[in-house]
C-alpha cells in the first residue's frame, strides 16, 4: 500500500504542475508547490522538479525553489517530481513539455496508470 500511496502523491503533483506550466509561470512557485505538498505528507523533493531540454538533455532553466525566473513560451522543459524511500523504493513520473502562452503541450505519450505485475511493481 505504501508504494501505491507514494505513487498517487507523485502523480497528483505531476498533474498539478502540468496545469501550472505556461508562459510567465513562476519556476519557484511551481517547485515550492510540490515541495510543500510532499512535506505535508512526510516526504522531501530531493532533486529539482525539472530542467530545460535543448542542445543538452539537462540545461537551464533548472526548475527548483531557488530559481526566480519564469517559464517562457517555446521552452522545452521536464516535469519530474519524485519521492525516494532509501533502501526500499522510489517513484518518479517524468514528462517533457513544450511551454505555450496558455499552458503546455505534453510531448511524452506514456500512460500513467499504476500496474502491479507478478509480485513486482511497475510504474508505467
Please describe what each predicted stretch is.
Residues 1-124:
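Active-site neighborhoods and metal-handling regions in enzymes and metal-associated proteins
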Amino acid at each position: 500500500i505504501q508504494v501505491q500511496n507514494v505513487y498517487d502523491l507523485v502523480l497528483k503533483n505531476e498533474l498539478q504542475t502540468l496545469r501550472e506550466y505556461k508562459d510567465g509561470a513562476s519556476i519557484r512557485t511551481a517547485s515550492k508547490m510540490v515541495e510543500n505538498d510532499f512535506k505535508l505528507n512526510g516526504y522531501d523533493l530531493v532533486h529539482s522538479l525539472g530542467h530545460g531540454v535543448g542542445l543538452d538533455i539537462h540545461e537551464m532553466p533548472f526548475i527548483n525553489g531557488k530559481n526566480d525566473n519564469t517559464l517562457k513560451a517555446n521552452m522545452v522543459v521536464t516535469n519530474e517530481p519524485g519521492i525516494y524511500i532509501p533502501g526500499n523504493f522510489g517513484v518518479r513520473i517524468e514528462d517533457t513539455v513544450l511551454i505555450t502562452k496558455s499552458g503546455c503541450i505534453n510531448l511524452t505519450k506514456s500512460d500513467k496508470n499504476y500496474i502491479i505485475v507478478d509480485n513486482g511493481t511497475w510504474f508505467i
